Regions:
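N-terminal catalytic or cofactor-binding beta/alpha core of small enzyme domains
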Residues: 1-108, 115-139
Length: 141
């Protein structure tokens, strides 16, 4: 994979959550990499009530800012490096599975080629992973 620096965030979050939630009931963590659409069969087979996508998305905010979005608040042109735009993936998932699809996005500093997360995005990683793990472990989530 030819990763672009901050675009590694989604995979890094998925890896952290897999470590933090190895046996959490009702939770599956899938690392979609640069083609999350390839995991739609796995997601459909699990039949979740919610799908949470984790990604670095240029949404015009301060780098490192975390935001929640649903399909209606994501523009087709919002910059990501995935083969299928996130809006279309979100629409497909919510149309093929009776579930709520949510994006937890982080504003990247850069999506240029690189091997490391930028400082503001890296600073967000551990606290966001901890918050998500705690939320997903909570009863009545």
């Amino acid at each position: 994979m030819d990763w672009k620096s901050d675009d590694r965030l989604g995979c890094a979050l998925a890896q952290a959550l897999a470590r933090l939630l190895p046996d959490a009931p009702g939770v599956r963590v899938a690392n979609g990499g640069e083609a999350p659409e390839n995991f739609t069969g796995t997601v459909r087979a699990f039949a979740p009530s919610h799908v949470v996508l984790l990604d670095a998305v240029d949404h015009g905010r301060e780098p490192g800012t975390v935001f929640l979005a649903d399909e209606r608040s994501i523009a087709v042109g919002d910059m990501t490096s995935h083969h299928l735009p996130l809006k279309l993936l979100m629409r497909y998932l919510s149309g093929s599975i009776p579930c709520r699809v949510i994006l937890v996005g982080v504003q990247p500093l850069t999506l240029r080629p690189g091997k490391r997360l930028s400082a503001p995005v890296k600073k967000t990683l551990a606290p966001l992973a901890g918050f998500l793990a705690q939320t997903l472990r909570s009863p009545g989530r």
